[in-house]
């Protein structure tokens, strides 16, 4: 009986010792972390022509060359602490905030917490389920830029040949960013300003400008519609231009307009493509031909011209 009592006492003492070690030597690191909220914006494309003149780090973004994220867009999130991954390729999906009408980013069920020392945050778009071998491994204590962290992904990225739909175009528009944190208390806000990792070719077509004799009717401009005959299929924009994303080299873009009567070929210049920059390529000088027009008939609109 005495032996059994001594045995039970030893068990209890050992259990207390283990609990003591756990509390003192293995603190719950994650308990000190705070919940994350995330916002994502796009830094846009800059003009290759203007950058050749200035080449400054700060950049003014032209309207129309930024991406507005919409409901359903998805990014991949990474967090590294002390050189070791904490979160890897967590899917963040854009959802509409019913209260504000803005965009908020939701995880696929993972609760994100951060705020410890030695953390770095990385984001890329568009999301890919398979990211094996597409990120670099930072050395312990080292801090990588997003370009360094995602270098394998960027180097191996190939924009699609056919970018003629909005979905196909955005699927080719690789962006990455490093995160910066603000906030105190129980919630940390994490902001990402995305940088485009491809170059952008903007194709301008010749235009027809309808000038109405009636001064109350403003001029109406119509860009020629192109048919692309090669493998490269750019996306037509609302302003009549075409856009095509390229990597380190641009393929020859071939096409025709005016019912097939006029053909054109576009090849890259020596100064383009450059990552994050756009350059305009003007077919036949993108000249505007003026046509005088007396008036619109009762049943006509400018779109009928």
Q: Which ranges hold each PLM region?
A:
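Sec-type signal peptide cleavage vicinity
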Residues: 3, 11, 21-297
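Single conserved hydrophobic/aromatic residue that forms the stacking wall/gate
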Residues: 295, 302-305
């Amino acid at each position: 009986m005495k032996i059994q009592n001594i045995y039970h006492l030893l068990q209890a003492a050992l259990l207390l010792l283990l609990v003591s070690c756990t509390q003192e030597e293995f603190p719950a690191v994650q308990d000190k972390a705070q919940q994350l909220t995330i916002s994502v914006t796009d830094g846009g494309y800059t003009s290759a022509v203007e950058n050749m003149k200035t080449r400054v780090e700060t950049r003014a973004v032209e309207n129309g060359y930024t991406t507005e994220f919409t409901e359903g867009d998805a990014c991949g999130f990474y967090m590294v602490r002390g050189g070791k991954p904490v979160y890897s390729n967590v899917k963040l999906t854009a959802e509409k905030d019913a209260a504000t009408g803005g965009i908020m980013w939701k995880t696929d069920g993972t609760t994100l917490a951060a705020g410890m020392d030695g953390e770095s945050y990385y984001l890329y778009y568009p999301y890919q389920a398979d990211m094996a071998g597409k990120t670099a491994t930072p050395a312990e204590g080292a801090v990588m830029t997003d370009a360094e962290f995602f270098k394998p992904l960027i180097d191996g990225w190939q924009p699609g040949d056919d970018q003629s739909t909005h979905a196909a175009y955005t699927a080719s528009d690789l962006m990455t960013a490093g995160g910066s944190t603000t906030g105190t208390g129980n919630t940390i806000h994490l902001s990402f300003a995305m940088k485009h990792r491809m170059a952008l070719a903007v194709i301008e077509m010749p235009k027809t400008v309808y000038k109405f004799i009636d001064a109350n009717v403003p001029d109406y401009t119509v860009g020629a519609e192109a048919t692309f005959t090669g493998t490269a299929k750019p996306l037509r924009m609302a302003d009549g231009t075409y856009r095509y994303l390229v990597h380190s080299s641009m393929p020859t873009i071939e096409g025709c307009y005016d019912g097939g009567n006029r053909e054109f070929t576009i090849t890259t210049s020596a100064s383009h493509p450059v990552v994050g920059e756009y350059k305009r390529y003007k077919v036949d000088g993108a000249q505007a031909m003026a046509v005088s027009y007396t008036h619109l008939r009762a049943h006509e609109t400018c779109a009928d011209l």
